[in-house]
């Protein structure tokens, strides 16, 4: 972020006063983390605090011994505010074989709170009413594809996982379940917690086949580039620079992108829309964002003290989450804020999010946005959020399957194949060869034991 140095300087002024220490913050680009994250930890570089997540190798790195254990004693001694103020379920969800290696955010992720950010000016230009279904979104995409030059309806890139989370998982009430970095298992929510026999192999479901067929039809209509898999410009950047008419992402990211666009291009009339109304919104894990202490850190206790302050001290929290008051944000009350003129120069930090101290954008008295209430206000808790799969006995099978899926899944989910059914059958066949059956047996065994443990 452009304002990163200024934010770090302001934060260090507070930390020197409160803890007699400073931090030196380094960033890994989102486009590079899959290649660089594990290499950085393996290098032995003396890092004291590092972002981690269920989607950013938490399970894999923790089981390799890359992270220090976070015990209850350490929390009580060095993170008393966190120990007292954070939901204990967050630390339960972070446990692997009974041990915790993460300080999760104090804000549960809602698995399917997935809006779409669109260009309101283009919607109005082509006379399209409120977009509140996948069919209406397709109408909007078709109008853009047929009439606009230099703008894709959706500038997909890489694996387009954000789109599949919305239009496959959320649309079908499919709750994904933790299995390393793969998207292999889940269950269809039907008003009750699942039994072990309700767990499905996602790539073998009729719903996944229908999703891939829909993506094939959209790709054939030119909704994204034929080279989308190798596209290195993120959909977020594409929307903000005007080469994409939509953005699929989680609610926080879409709201942040809307803020940037509203500031830089108000004439685009950016709109957040919900194309899957009526689906069940399920609270997922706290471990969707958090921080770990690398095992090589020489300052582990001090690192925990710093995290405690960043998460629960109001002054430090505002700096970390919103930047510089009067520049990147303006506090309008103790609980609200408006965007500053330099807001685009600083991005909010995910891993520290704490619902106790979060501000709502707007003037004093502002309440949550309608779209946020719609997507998150009725979220329910369910049993699988605390289940973390231990992949230590199937690492080779998972590695082989990840390799297979990296070749097939992006093409299927972007519709860039000639024969959807044939390609999907080939994917499943190669996964079987790679060890899918062994993986499923181990997964079901662990999930069964997890359910039995909840009954004791």
Where are these regions (language model features)?
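Extracytoplasmic/secretory soluble proteins
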Residues: 1-456
